[in-house]
Swiss-Prot record:
GO annotation, cellular component aspect: cytosol; IHF-DNA complex; protein-DNA complex
Swiss-Prot/TrEMBL GO biological process terms: DNA recombination; DNA replication; DNA-templated transcription; regulation of translation
PANTHER family membership: DNA-BINDING PROTEIN HU (PTHR33175), INTEGRATION HOST FACTOR SUBUNIT ALPHA (PTHR33175:SF2)
Organism: Escherichia coli (strain K12)
Disruption phenotype: Increased in vivo levels of ATP-DnaA.
NCBIfam families: himA, PRK00285.1
Protein name stated in the entry: Integration host factor subunit alpha
Gene (name only): ihfA
Length: 99
């Protein structure tokens, strides 16, 4: 099971008493700000959670799995996430819930 933006909005509605519309907008604005920062080449640091970074990957050789033909994989920029120590600890110490 995955946590969705809709579930996050519902949680804000329940816990903070925001209207459903405001809760949904808050979640959307939060993620939009992260997207904007990354698009502008900025690192995103969320204290107690982790960091979103941009990494430039060089061109490298690859292979077409269907034909076996050698093809170049073009250089590109990717987003990486490094969890913070607090998040790592909480996940490691959490007991998994039955699905």
């Amino acid at each position: 099971m995955a946590l969705t933006k809709a579930e996050m909005s519902e949680y804000l509605f329940d816990k903070l008493g925001l209207s459903k519309r405001d809760a949904k907008e808050l979640v959307e604005l939060f993620f939009e700000e992260i997207r904007r920062a990354l698009e502008n080449g900025e690192q995103v640091k969320l204290s107690g959670f982790g960091n979103f970074d941009l990494r430039d990957k060089n061109q490298r050789p690859g292979r077409n799995p269907k034909t076996g033909e050698d093809i170049p994989i073009t250089a590109r920029r990717v987003v990486t996430f490094r969890p913070g120590q607090k998040l790592k600890s909480r996940v490691e110490n959490a007991s998994p819930k039955d699905e």
